[in-house]
């Protein structure tokens, strides 16, 4: 049962930096610049600590990809969001619905909360 295991660990190394940006004390970065570099590279960290780096050139190439120009296959139809707003009911019909909604009625003490047949 006792067998020799040949498990070896690789020493961890830091990600090499190619460019350092020195900021003076008191210099505030705008919120949009927190995860970017002066060269346009975007970087992020997952909750597990994995570092993700997106090169600007790669992102610009993805923008022109045919995949970005087609919607997902099983996308639901939501008027005004995933389909043009031409499917909406006329404005007059929507206003009539809003006028007759029970929420707009004034709450009086003599009206019961609901009706019940006994």
Swiss-Prot record:
The modification N-acetylserine is found at residue 2. Transmembrane segments: none annotated. Keywords: Acetylation, Cytoplasm, Isopeptide bond, Nucleus, Phosphoprotein, Protein synthesis inhibitor, Translation regulation, Ubl conjugation. Residues 27-48, 64-118 are annotated as: Disordered. One of its GO terms (cellular component) is cytoplasm. A motif (YXXXXLphi motif) lies at residues 54-60. It is found in: Cytoplasm; Nucleus. The modification Phosphothreonine is found at residues 37, 41, 46, 50, 70, 77. The modification Phosphoserine is found at residues 44, 65, 83, 100-101, 112. The keyword Nucleus applies. The modification Phosphotyrosine is found at residue 54. The keyword Cytoplasm applies. A motif (TOS motif) lies at residues 114-118. InterPro entries: EIF4EBP (IPR008606). GO terms for molecular function: eukaryotic initiation factor 4E binding; translation repressor activity. Pfam families: eIF_4EBP. There is a cross-link at residue 57 (Glycyl lysine isopeptide (Lys-Gly) (interchain with G-Cter in ubiquitin)). Hypophosphorylated EIF4EBP1 competes with EIF4G1/EIF4G3 to interact with EIF4E; insulin stimulated MAP-kinase (MAPK1 and MAPK3) or mTORC1 phosphorylation of EIF4EBP1 causes dissociation of the complex allowing EIF4G1/EIF4G3 to bind and consequent initiation of translation. Interacts (via TOS motif) with RPTOR; promoting phosphorylation by mTORC1. Belongs to the eIF4E-binding protein family. The TOS motif mediates interaction with RPTOR, leading to promote phosphorylation by mTORC1 complex. This is Eukaryotic translation initiation factor 4E-binding protein 1. It comes from Bos taurus. The gene is EIF4EBP1.
């Amino acid at each position: 049962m006792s067998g020799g295991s040949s498990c070896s660990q690789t020493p961890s190394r830091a990600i090499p930096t190619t460019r350092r940006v020195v900021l003076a004390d008191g210099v505030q970065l705008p919120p949009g610049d927190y995860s970017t570099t002066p060269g346009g590279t975007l970087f992020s960290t997952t909750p597990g600590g994995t570092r993700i780096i997106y090169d600007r050139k790669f992102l610009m190439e993805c923008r022109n990809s045919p995949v970005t120009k087609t919607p997902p296959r099983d996308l639901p139809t939501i008027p005004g969001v995933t389909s043009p707003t031409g499917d909406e009911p006329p404005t007059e019909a929507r206003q009539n619905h809003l006028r007759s909604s029970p929420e707009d009625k004034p709450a009086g003490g003599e009206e019961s909360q609901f009706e019940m047949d006994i």
